[in-house]
Design a protein with these regions (language model features):
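N-terminal or membrane-proximal amphipathic helix/coiled-coil initiation segments that transition from
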Residues: 1-13, 120-123
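Extended aliphatic helical segments
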Residues: 8, 25, 57-62, 72, ...
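Amphipathic alpha-helical coiled-coil segments
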Residues: 11, 15-32, 36-39, 46, ...
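Extended, charged amphipathic alpha-helical "stalk" segments
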Residues: 27-33, 63, 69, 119-120
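Short coil/loop "hinge" linkers that interrupt or connect long alpha-helical coiled-coils or helical hairpins
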Residues: 45-71
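Short, charged, intrinsically disordered terminal tails
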Residues: 111-122
Length: 123
């Protein structure tokens, strides 16, 4: 690392940080997508039961009775909110990926310019 210019060292550090941020965003997106699938599965289950059926909902470690229309509305709102979060994360991910690629290209260009020319081999 000692023969790499400080500017390139800083760019490498930024690249590593950006890579970690990309991994974090991807993990969050995966969690939200799983929550969406789970909520949609619950919505499908609720379609098959009568409007006046007893429904129980987990609230932390407690199960509470809830009216079906209220829970259906709650699930719809939850899915909508999660979908918005996923879209936001996708935008962030796309911007970060573009920045990552640009930074990678800049670093490669800087390192290629710094390399001494390879002498021709004698045959």
């Amino acid at each position: 690392m000692e023969n790499i210019p400080p500017k390139v060292q800083n760019q490498l550090a930024m690249l590593q940080q950006l890579q970690q941020q990309l991994q974090t965003v991807a993990a969050q997106k995966t969690q939200y997508e799983m929550a969406i699938r789970e909520s949609r599965r619950a919505q499908e289950e609720l379609k098959d039961i009568p409007e006046d059926a007893e429904i129980f909902v987990n609230v932390g470690t407690v199960m509470m009775q809830e009216k079906k229309p209220r829970e259906v509305a709650s699930l719809a709102e939850k899915v909508e909110t999660l979908e918005l979060r996923v879209k936001s994360l996708e935008k962030q991910e796309k911007a970060m990926q573009a920045r990552f690629e640009q930074l990678s290209t800049d670093i490669k260009g800087s390192l290629d310019r710094k390399k001494p020319p390879v002498p021709p081999t004698a045959e």
